Regions:
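Short gly/ser-rich loop at a beta-strand->alpha-helix junction or flexible surface loop bordering the NTP-binding
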Residues: 1-185, 324, 331-345
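Surface segments flanking catalytic/ligand-binding clefts of nucleic-acid enzymes
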Residues: 164-345
Length: 345
C-alpha cells in the first residue's frame, strides 16, 4: 500500500492490551517521508514483515493480513469485526470492508506513532486515551488512565494476572498531549477525566481503591480527587525503634486530612506479611496518620464495602451519602472495578 496503515481507537487499545510492555518501541518519523518507517532508535529485533508494502496490494487483502497478525498476538477474532485506522486528512480516507477509517484532520504527530510491523503502525496510549472517549464509558476511561500511568500492565483480554513494570506515562504527559490542541475530538473530556487520575498505581487493586475514592459521586465514587498514590513516609529517627523499615508507602493518601488507605489482599494473609502490616500500621498511627484498611473480602461484598467507604468519607471529612440511589451506583462501581479479579481478591 502507498501509505502505512495506522491502527487507532479501539483496535489500538486492543493492541496495547496484548503487546508485551518490555518490547522496545519503534517510533515513526512521518507518514509522508520516504523514510517514514525509520526508527528514532534501532530496535533490538527486526520488525515483522507482513507484506503490507507490496505494490498493488488490494485493500481487502490488507484487512486480512492485519486481522491475522492481530489474532496471532492474542486478540480474539470476534473483537475484529472491523479494524479502526487513522489517516491525516479526509482525502486519504478509504472505506474497504473491514476497515473503519478515522480522520485526524492534520498530520498525525509522529511522536505518537509506534511502528509494530513493516507497513503497520499504532497510535501510542496517550493518543489512544483521548480517542477512548468515543467508545468507553467515563469509569472505563478513568480506569484506563490509571492503567496507562501505572507501574503494572493488565491484559483485559486475558485471564492471566497483571505484571509489574516501570511507569510508561505520567499524568502530566497525558495532560500535555490533551493541551496540544484542546479542539481535538475527545481532548476536553480526556483532560477532565485526568483530573481524577494519579500516577504510579502498583496493582489493579490499588487502581480499584483509588477509583472508589476519586470517581464522581454520580458514578458511585466519593468524588474526592485530591489524593496521592504510594505516598512515601520516612520514619523519623525518634520512631525508628518501632520499625525495621526506614520508610513506608501509603497506597492511597489524602493530604488534607492525613488519611491513609491500605489495600490488603489475600497475599497479606501470610503470617510474616501480617506482622509487617501490623508494624506499619502502628508506626503510621503513631506519626498521626488516620489509617483505614480495605480488604478483598470487603470489595467482594456490597454492604461491607459501603460501610468501609463511609468510614473513609468520615475520616476525610466529607459527607457520607447513605441514600439507596447512591448505594446502587456505588455497587455498580464496585462490580466494575473488580470484574477482572478472577477470585484473586
Amino acid at each position: 500500500m502507498d501509505l502505512p496503515i495506522v491502527l487507532s481507537h479501539k483496535t489500538a487499545w486492543l493492541y496495547h492490551n496484548v503487546a508485551r510492555p518490555s518490547e522496545p518501541f519503534s517510533r515513526a518519523s512521518s507518514l509522508y517521508d520516504e523514510d517514514s518507517l525509520a526508527n528514532e532508535a534501532e530496535p533490538t529485533a527486526s520488525l515483522p514483515k507482513l507484506g503490507l508494502d507490496a505494490k498493488g496490494l488490494r485493500a481487502s487483502t490488507a484487512v486480512e493480513i492485519v486481522a491475522d497478525y492481530l489474532i496471532s498476538l492474542g486478540i480474539p477474532r470476534e473483537e475484529l469485526d472491523h479494524i479502526d485506522t487513522l489517516v491525516n486528512f479526509d482525502f486519504e480516507r478509504s472505506t474497504p470492508a473491514g476497515f473503519r477509517c478515522h480522520v485526524f484532520g492534520a498530520p498525525v504527530p509522529p511522536g505518537h506513532l509506534i511502528e509494530v510491523a513493516e507497513g503497520l503502525l499504532v497510535v501510542d496510549e496517550a493518543m489512544c486515551f483521548v480517542q477512548a472517549g468515543s467508545w468507553m464509558s467515563e469509569p472505563e476511561q478513568l480506569e484506563y488512565g490509571y492503567e496507562i500511568c501505572a507501574r503494572y500492565h493488565l491484559n483485559h483480554l486475558s485471564t492471566g494476572d497483571y505484571i509489574e513494570m516501570g511507569q510508561r506515562y505520567t499524568v502530566a504527559d497525558m495532560i500535555a498531549y490533551c493541551n496540544e490542541d484542546r479542539s481535538r475530538q475527545g481532548a476536553i473530556r480526556a483532560a477532565a477525566v485526568l483530573k481524577r487520575v494519579h500516577d504510579g498505581a502498583r496493582s489493579p487493586m490499588e487502581t480499584a481503591t483509588a477509583i472508589m475514592v476519586a470517581a464522581k459521586r454520580s458514578q458511585g465514587g466519593l468524588g474526592y480527587a485530591k489524593i496521592e498514590l504510594n505516598h512515601r513516609v520516612d520514619v523519623p529517627n525518634e520512631f525508628k525503634y518501632l520499625a525495621k523499615a526506614g520508610y513506608f508507602e501509603i497506597d492511597v493518601y489524602a493530604p488534607a486530612s492525613g488519611t491513609g488507605i491500605e489495600y490488603n489482599g489475600s497475599d497479606h494473609l501470610d503470617k510474616q506479611r501480617s506482622a509487617s502490616d501490623a508494624e506499619r500500621m502502628t508506626v503510621l498511627s503513631a506519626l498521626g496518620f488516620r489509617m483505614i484498611v480495605l480488604t478483598g473480602i470487603q470489595f467482594a461484598h456490597q454492604l461491607q464495602l459501603h460501610r468501609a467507604m463511609n468510614a473513609i468519607a468520615l475520616a476525610m471529612g466529607i459527607k457520607c451519602d447513605r441514600s439507596e440511589a447512591f448505594q446502587k451506583r456505588q455497587n455498580d462501581l464496585r462490580e466494575f472495578v473488580i470484574r477482572h479479579w478472577e477470585g484473586g481478591l
